Every structure is written in structure tokens, then in C-alpha cells.
């Protein structure tokens, strides 16, 4: 399973990319606004760091506006993927863009119906939001299992990106269910490195080594 980093923070992207953990990046207008920088400049810099796909979201809500924005976004770098909202207008745009060879990531997916429709329209990726479903009293991971099964049944090439990841368990469940990608906030990815028994083991090794050095 691929790890995408869900952030527009260039320093964090560099940090985790140096560890070999970043297969791609997803951004949205909120994440970029937090950086206080020009939208296009941020996307270009991220694309220069990461070899994999970098999702950049359109702002327009009408198909014509989305298509126009998408054509401009893909001029920024070869690895830009255009993020499109799951609406009728969004899928209309996806249908046009896919025929032009422009990769798309349909976001704000909350049902298998939506994922299937996005795939039919030609989406490269679909992004179901598991954390937000959990917040709404549903089990977000059930949706991932459902989408993966449907796509497997029919050999659908659209990749499933598990989004709105809240904790490391979401990541492991995504891998168990066969999702193609989990897009992970850096705070969650950072937690995945740690386990108390690892810390305890290192502490024990160091004590043993110090004791050995004393007795030499």
C-alpha cells in the first residue's frame, strides 16, 4: 500500500520523503491556506520534492470552471493530479479531463455509489473520508471494504485513497482491506514509528552495553 502525506507543509514533506515514506502528497485549499503562501508556488515546490502524484484541488464548483483550472494546474508539473469534488458538475469535469489524459482525484466520497460513479466517469483516484464518517456515527472502514470489493469484482482501475485518516489503526485497516493508498497527516505518520516495547528494548540494550563497557 502506498503512503501519501496529507499536508502542504514543505518541511514535513522533506522530512518524511528523506525516510522513504512518501509515495505522493494530497493537499486542499485549507491546508495550503495554513502555509500562508501562494497556491501555485506551494504546489510547484512540493512537486519538485516528491516524484509521485501530488493532488491539487480546484476551487470552482461548475464543470467549465473546474476544467479550466485543471488545465492550468497540470502545467505546474508533470506529477500534478487534479482534485475534484464529488458532485454532478465535478464528474462532468472528470469525464472531460480523463479523455484529455489529465489525472483526477475525486474527493469527498462518502458512499460506494459515489465511488462507483466517479470511477465510471474516469477518475484516476477516489478519496473516501473515513474519519468524517466515524464522526457521523458510521464505521468509515466498512466503506473502504465495500469500495475495494466492488472495484475488485469488476477490475476497475481507479485507485482507492483512504482519506480523513485519524490514527494509525486507520492505516493498518486500510492495508488489511486492500486499499491502494492511505493519505496520512504527518502527526499520524509520526505516531506509527513508535511503540513502548521498542523504547524499552533500546533502553535495555543501552544499559547492557554500558555494563559491558564497565567490565572490559
From Swiss-Prot:
InterPro entries (UniProt xref): Aldolase_TIM (IPR013785), TAL/FSA (IPR001585), Transaldolase_3B (IPR022999), Transaldolase_3B/F6P_aldolase (IPR004731), Transaldolase_AS (IPR018225), TSA/FSA_arc/bac (IPR033919)
PROSITE patterns noted in UniProt: TRANSALDOLASE_1
Domain of life: Archaea
GO molecular function, one term: transaldolase activity
Record keywords, A-Z: Cytoplasm, Pentose shunt, Schiff base, Transferase
Compartments reported by the entry: Cytoplasm
EC id: 2.2.1.2
Listed GO CC annotations: cytoplasm
GO biological process, one term: pentose-phosphate shunt
Pfam families per record: TAL_FSA
Location, primary (coarse class): cytoplasm
Catalytic activity of the protein: D-sedoheptulose 7-phosphate + D-glyceraldehyde 3-phosphate = D-erythrose 4-phosphate + beta-D-fructose 6-phosphate
Pathway it works in: Carbohydrate degradation; pentose phosphate pathway; D-glyceraldehyde 3-phosphate and beta-D-fructose 6-phosphate from D-ribose 5-phosphate and D-xylulose 5-phosphate (non-oxidative stage): step 2/3
Catalytic residues, chain numbering: 83
Gene3D superfamilies: Aldolase class I (3.20.20.70)
UniProt keyword annotation of Calcium present: no
Family: Belongs to the transaldolase family. Type 3B subfamily.
Function: Transaldolase is important for the balance of metabolites in the pentose-phosphate pathway.
The protein's name: Probable transaldolase
Lineage of origin: Archaea, Methanobacteriati, Methanobacteriota, Methanomada group, Methanococci
Amino acid at each position: 500500500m502506498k503512503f501519501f502525506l496529507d499536508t502542504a507543509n514543505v518541511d514535513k514533506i522533506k522530512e518524511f520523503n528523506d525516510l522513504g515514506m512518501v509515495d505522493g502528497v494530497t493537499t486542499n485549499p485549507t491546508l495550503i491556506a495554513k502555509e500562508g503562501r501562494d497556491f501555485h508556488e506551494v504546489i510547484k515546490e512540493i512537486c519538485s520534492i516528491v516524484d509521485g502524484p501530488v493532488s491539487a484541488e480546484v476551487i470552482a464548483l461548475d464543470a467549465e470552471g473546474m476544467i479550466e483550472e485543471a488545465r492550468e494546474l497540470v502545467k505546474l508539473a508533470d506529477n500534478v493530479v487534479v482534485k475534484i469534488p464529488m458532485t454532478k458538475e465535478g464528474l462532468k469535469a472528470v469525464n472531460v479531463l480523463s479523455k484529455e489524459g489529465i489525472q483526477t482525484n475525486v474527493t469527498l466520497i462518502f458512499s460506494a455509489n459515489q465511488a462507483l460513479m466517479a470511477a465510471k466517469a474516469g477518475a484516476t483516484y477516489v478519496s473516501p473520508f473515513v474519519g468524517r464518517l466515524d464522526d457521523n456515527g458510521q464505521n468509515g472502514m466498512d466503506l473502504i471494504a465495500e469500495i475495494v470489493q466492488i472495484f475488485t469484482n469488476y477490475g476497475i482501475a481507479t485507485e482507492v485513497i483512504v482519506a480523513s485518516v485519524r490514527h494509525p489503526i486507520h492505516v493498518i485497516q486500510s492495508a488489511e482491506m486492500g486499499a491502494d493508498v492511505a493519505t496520512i497527516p504527518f502527526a499520524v505518520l509520526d505516531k506509527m514509528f513508535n511503540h513502548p516495547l521498542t523504547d524499552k528494548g533500546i533502553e535495555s540494550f543501552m544499559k547492557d552495553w554500558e555494563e559491558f563497557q564497565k567490565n572490559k
